[in-house]
From Swiss-Prot:
Coiled coil (UniProt feature): none
Family: Belongs to the UPF0173 family.
Source organism of the structure: Staphylococcus aureus (strain MRSA252)
A single GO molecular function term of this UniProt record: hydrolase activity
Protein name, as recorded: UPF0173 metal-dependent hydrolase SAR1785
PANTHER family membership: UPF0173 METAL-DEPENDENT HYDROLASE MJ1163, UPF0173 METAL-DEPENDENT HYDROLASE MJ1163-RELATED
InterPro entries, sorted: Metallo-B-lactamas, RibonucZ/Hydroxyglut_hydro, UPF0173, UPF0173_UPF0282_UlaG_hydrolase
The organism's taxonomic lineage, starting at the top: Bacteria, Bacillati, Bacillota, Bacilli, Bacillales
Superkingdom assignment: Bacteria
Stored Gene3D superfamilies: Ribonuclease Z/Hydroxyacylglutathione hydrolase-like
Length: 229
């Protein structure tokens, strides 16, 4: 299995001969190294509806015929408003099996909407974190979130091999809360900081996060770099 980071919160997972992308913010992402014209995926998984996560989902889903997995509201919106054919709606606490592995959505403390060109936001369900089980490994993508103690319950139920955690502050946890979450609640084997440096408001030094974490290993990935098992 291979996990690649592509800026902001975009993660590319390759496992069981399938390709999965999380939060495909590609075209307007100054930190993304991917090209929307050449990306190949079988599944697209969404944590929530904000532009820097919802990103290129419509174009990518139509181009690749990938199945989009997200909240029930996002699935309905993509199907009815954008004509995306392959959608799989879920909600917090739900788990579903796919041919690459399983997806379970868990709690995240954030918000979730998509703003149309007319300036009106569309509610797209609850924000969520994702627990993947692929090839015997557990990956926890926290999504955009603040710190909450039930991260420890998530990790107790699903001991985490790799955790992708936001450190950008302002909209999500910053370095202090993110490192606390890793040290006290999640305790993964590998931590990967995400959701930072894409915009001025979330500029951070990931080395400070690495220095603050005292459990497992911290991998600071540049866009295009990966963790492989």
């Amino acid at each position: 299995m291979k996990l690649s980071f592509h800026g902001q919160s975009t993660i590319y997972l390759e496992g069981n001969n399938k390709k999965v992308i999380v939060d495909p913010f590609i075209s307007n992402n100054p930190k993304c190294d991917l090209n929307i014209e050449t990306v190949q995926v079988d599944y697209i998984v969404l944590t929530h509806g904000h532009f820097d996560h919802f990103g290129d989902v419509v174009e990518l889903a139509k181009k690749t015929e990938a199945t989009v997995i997200g909240s029930a509201e996002m699935a309905d919106y993509l199907s009815s408003y954008h004509g995306v054919e392959n959608v799989h709606g879920m909600n917090i606490g739900g788990k579903a099996n796919f041919d690459f592995g399983s997806v379970k959505f868990v709690q995240a403390f954030h918000s979730s909407s998509f703003t149309h060109e007319n300036g009106i936001p569309v509610y797209l369900g609850m924000p969520m974190g994702i627990v993947f089980e692929v090839e015997g490994k557990t990956i926890y993508h926290t999504g955009d979130t603040g710190l909450f103690s039930d991260m420890s319950l998530i990790a107790k139920r699903h001991p985490v091999d790799v955790c992708f955690v936001p450190i950008g502050d302002n909209f999500t946890m910053g370095i202090d809360d993110a490192s606390y979450a890793i040290n006290e609640f999640i305790k993964p084997k590998i931590s990967v900081p995400i959701h930072y440096d894409t915009f001025p408001l979330i500029e951070q030094d990931p080395q400070q996060f690495k220095d603050a974490v005292n459990v497992g290993d911290v991998q600071i990935l540049k866009p295009g770099e990966s963790v492989q098992f």
